[in-house]
Amino acid sequence: KNILVFGPTMEASQLEASKSFTKNMCKHKKIPTGNYEIFSRVDDAKKFLREQPTPYVIKADGLAAGKGVLVSSDIEEADNFISSIFAGKIGTVKSKVIIEEYLEGKEMSVFFAIDKKTIKYIGSAQDYKRAFDHDRGPNTGGMGAFSPSPLLTKKILEKILNKIIKPTVEYMKETGNEFSGILYAGLVLNNGEPKLIEYNVRFGDPECQVLCVRLGAQIFDIYFSGAKNELSSLSINEACDSAITVIVAEKGYPKNPRSDCKLNDIVDIKYNKALKIFHAGTYFKNNLLCNTGGRIFSFTVRSKNLKDARTIVYLS
């Protein structure tokens, strides 16, 4: 219908939608990732779990709004999580379960724009998944992020491209599922060696906020050039600055968030021209701003360095 689209097909989006698909691809292409096993039966998964060292890493195969992963040393918690996945309580459908090796190291996210001819690096970030301060509590869709990641060097980026991204793009082409769009690689770095944790086939939330404020209007050039398979002619400049975003979430998130709360009287924002507020779970009712539960806003600041950006966002 003559509509320009920059994004993967449904088949290519399996890179995010099915962890078992991506893990099996890694095995086939020798892409560095954690060792793993895939289970279709609850008893088999729990039996295997008891043979593994802690902490356990358990994942629902399908999409789960950022809540389909458990990292825990508690066998009872791990058992309950497995049971919930097979019962269809976690994720969109009754899912297979992946139990994988816990990878030591520091995590980061690296982002690429990809068309049928070209792979372009467009930025990096680090995010915080746990609900509470000091990286504690259950996993969420993301409670904050900053960009760029100080872990990423030119040498490490080269390794990520050659050992992870290029083999992935090759595999998708070989299997008739050629990828185009934004590819977000969630990685762990240990002794200078990157390993793949997972893929998203989009920017991610809240990573999108910090990347887009730093890319500025270039984001539109990326979209249009990518949709027309012209990324090779595009020069992308990563700004020499930093951005940070902090999520404001409803009490009880992610397990039992309240909803329909009126926000007008409780939001006291100290204005700063560097601050951008992105709405998530909000709506207007009778001229009052209300929430739908879960993540409500992200407060995002771009500044000359991360320390300044962090100061401004928390003062706001």
Task: Describe these PLM feature segments.
Residues I160-L183, N200-A274, A280-K285:
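Active-site "cap" helix and flanking loop/linker of ATP-utilizing ligase/carboxylase catalytic domains
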Residues K1-A17, K30-S40:
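A short, GP-enriched loop/loop-strand-helix hinge that lies immediately N-terminal to
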Residues Q14-S20, F132-H134:
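Short, charged, surface-exposed secondary-structure boundary motifs
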Residues G68-L211:
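Internal nucleotide-binding/catalytic subdomain
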Residues G66-G68, I244, G293-F299:
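Short amphipathic alpha-helical segments
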Residues K285, N291-S316:
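Generic C-terminus detector
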Residues V5-P8, N35-I38, Y56-A60, V71, ...:
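General beta-strand structural signal in soluble alpha/beta enzymes
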